[in-house]
UniProtKB/Swiss-Prot annotation:
Gene Ontology molecular function, alphabetical: glutaminase activity; imidazoleglycerol-phosphate synthase activity; lyase activity
Physiological role: IGPS catalyzes the conversion of PRFAR and glutamine to IGP, AICAR and glutamate. The HisH subunit catalyzes the hydrolysis of glutamine to glutamate and ammonia as part of the synthesis of IGP and AICAR. The resulting ammonia molecule is channeled to the active site of HisF.
Active site: residue positions: 81, 190, 192
Enzyme Commission numbers on file: 4.3.2.10, 3.5.1.2
Name of protein: Imidazole glycerol phosphate synthase subunit HisH
Cellular component, GO, one term: cytoplasm
């Protein structure tokens, strides 16, 4: 049976992610902060919620920045929400934070004066929104284009390499909802909270060989 390591660095509701993975038959799901267990896993999931400064402080304290660089190179790897944002170069949050830098680009604030067609938009962006699939990726298998996923975020990703944007969203501004490169895939939305389409994405991840 394959193993899926859900990286635990003290930030995020990891059990909901683990339960969703178990629900789709992903294999043996391990919530762990043990680097050896993470290195031995067949697949790795990197979730996260909260302030990016706190997240990055814990990631660096535990040595997970270098570990994430290592394990995301040679097996299927999925970043979720702040776990995705941590993979970028930097974030504007908390007066600026350097991140892991696996994907070029920056995490930017939606702003307090966000408008669309004369309507003021609340920040954080919270709720269901469409994701436009930019390319045909294995993790989009059996998920229709413009499927709706569940988002909760005040900061959005401005990708540095448009070719890595495999899914985009819009909330006052266009933003990268999904990034991919090699065996790495990352999403701003919460698949574990996104019902049918979110579970399908996790099922696709569980079956993906990491090639793209």
């Amino acid at each position: 049976m394959q193993t899926v390591a859900v990286i635990d660095y003290g930030m995020g509701n990891l059990h909901s992610v683990a339960k969703a993975l178990e629900h789709v038959g992903a294999g043996k799901v391990l919530i762990t902060s043990d680097a050896a267990v993470i290195r031995e896993a067949d697949r790795v999931v990197f979730p996260g919620v909260g302030a990016i400064r706190d997240c990055m402080a814990e990631i660096r304290r535990l040595g997970f920045d270098s570990l994430v660089r290592e394990v995301s190179q040679d097996r299927p790897f999925l970043g979720i929400c702040v776990g995705m944002q941590a993979l970028l170069d930097s974030s504007e949050e908390n007066d600026g934070v350097d991140c892991i830098g696996l994907f070029p680009g920056a995490v930017k604030f939606f702003g307090k004066d966000l408008h669309e067609d004369g309507e003021h938009l609340k920040v954080p962006h919270m709720g269901w929104n469409e994701v436009k699939q930019a390319v045909d990726h294995p993790l989009w298998h059996n998920i229709p284009d413009l499927a709706r996923f569940y988002f909760v975020h005040s900061y959005y990703i401005a990708a540095g390499n448009p070719r890595q944007v495999v899914g985009s969203g819009h909330y006052g501004v266009d933003f990268a909802a999904a990034l991919a490169e090699g065996s790495r895939f990352a999403v701003q939305f919460h698949p574990e909270k996104s019902h049918t389409h979110g579970l399908q994405l996790l099922q696709n991840f569980a079956a993906w060989d990491g090639r793209w």
